[in-house]
Amino acid sequence: MDAVVRPEPQTTELHRTIDWKDAFWVASGVPALVLFSIGGIAGTVGNPACAVWAVSMLFGFVQSFTYAEIAGLFPNKSGGASVYGAAAWLKYSKLIAPLSVWCNWLAWTPVLSLGCTIAAGYILNAFAPIPAADAPAVQQWLATHGGKTAVDAAAALTPGIRTWSMLDMTLIGVHISLGATFFIGVALTLIVFAIQHRGILGTARVQMVVGLLVIIPMLVFGIVPFFNGHVSQANFSPFVPLATPYAAAPGAWNRSGWTLVLGGLFIAAWSTYAFETAICYTSEFKNPGRDTFNAIFSSGLLCIVIFTLVPFTFQGFLGVKGMISPGVVDGTGVAAVMADMVGGGALTKGLLVLLMVLALLLSTMTAMAGSSRTLYQGSVDGWLPRYLSHVNTHGAPTRAMWTDLTFNLMLLSLTSSDTASFYFVLALSNCGYIIFNFLNLNAGWIHRIDNGHIARPWKAPAFVIAAGAVLAFVNAMLLGAGARVWNPHALWAGFVAAALIIPVFWFRHYVQDGGRFPARMLEDLGSVDGQLGERRAGVLPYVALAGGVLVVLVSAWVFRP
């Protein structure tokens, strides 16, 4: 039996002020995550890229039903599936439970820095563009500088703000830069923080307006090209992976090709699974029993449409050669492509730049809302330092938000430096996300065994829970096979980042709480005085963990980049 300790008094608690429609709008930033890696996946996988997005989205949708069920067990918790899943693992390991929460936060919080990096790139392109090779200024420069190339001309005519940097260095093979992109990204991050400071209801209202401005155009660009003849069947043939990433030469369905496809599925999961954030707000729902399922189901349907249509039309319009162009790979040229897809001119492109900035800010607002509540609930439940359990009078977890902000200002120095560092952070973040998904998909059946007597507002069919458990091991394979496609150090760096929870949890649990858990941690499961109850699942959770580790190691060995 675990003794319990009462948490320190809080200024206030999260407020029950929203319903599922508000959560839907808060999660409406998830479809914009397609913009983060649409070029990277196409440049890595080739013509099967659109199928990669569709398959990954199918995985995410099936998994969401497990998360919807376990969220219903905890009407008084916030923070998302990682928090609800952690309660299942607690009986079996004090360390695995906080690992779930930590890895979820590691996955979500970098959205702020990654999104603001791309948005800053859009802003720089609008006000200080790099001249195109056929620009009049370039031609004039070449005429007066004999023997020079268009590359020389572009370098000479590039505005100084594009190359200026207060700090430029390489640390452990990763480029760090404090240039214009960094400082614009800082400004955008502060704007997101200011909006979030008003609480979840105010955030939902802002995101509803921004979401409509973003989602409707994305639907237009996903549908119109089918009717104006801008989707070419030839751009999907031959339907084989690339021989080498970012080179348009077709490869084959051999081990090398499958490695690239699994790498694409790995990084796509970071975007396509992310609508599970809709259940981060259970303790803020007016009617959690109804709102929890409706929120994640409606968000999932929206994501199915966006994540299926947009990659398909992009590829059908551009082809692989267009998809691997630098502007598409780094995300800053997507607006121009969208304008061309619907036949727009300069005005349309300008409006789309604004919409893309709004889309990226929408995704960062979604990320801060969810990740800060994960930190908050992790603190309330005794996983993370007590400092994070404070909320302001609007019901916003401000100390968790400040932690998110500070961490992402540091990440911005990496993500804003170059494309390689951007994808390293993305891959590292996704290692945490896959670990979280593995633990929480298994938490579904553990809760069924250990807490089957607890009423569930919505209960998934047994075969769906079983399918989620199978997908847990599919995700483990994607982790082992796919992470190193994006960076040779990503997999092991991801394990190191995940292990950082050990000193954090040790400090909270043994230093701050004296080895005891807060009394309210398991109140939704009917726990009395912190009793964890019988381990009815026996050794099965340990078998699942061992199996997951084995799958990661074997797939990492078999699918070596």
Regions found by a protein language model. Give the residues of each.
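Membrane-helix boundary/coupling elements in multi-pass transport proteins
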Residues: 79, 103-121, 267-285, 346-385, ...
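Hydrophobic, membrane-embedded alpha-helices of multi-pass small-molecule transporters
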Residues: 18-36, 56, 64, 184-191, ...
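C-terminal membrane-solvent junction of multi-pass transporters and transport-like membrane proteins
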Residues: 177-180, 390-396, 437-487, 507, ...
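Membrane-interface loop-to-helix entry segments
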Residues: 180-240, 296-300, 426-439, 466, ...
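Hydrophobic alpha-helical segments and their helix-loop junctions in multi-pass secondary transporters
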Residues: 121, 126-128, 212-246, 313-318, ...
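Extracellular loop-to-transmembrane helix junctions
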Residues: 34-141, 145, 159, 165-174, ...
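TM-loop-TM module centered on a large, flexible mid-protein loop between adjacent transmembrane helices
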Residues: 82-90, 124-155, 239-252, 295-365, ...
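Membrane-interface "cap" regions at the ends of multi-pass membrane proteins
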Residues: 1-50, 54, 60-68, 76, ...
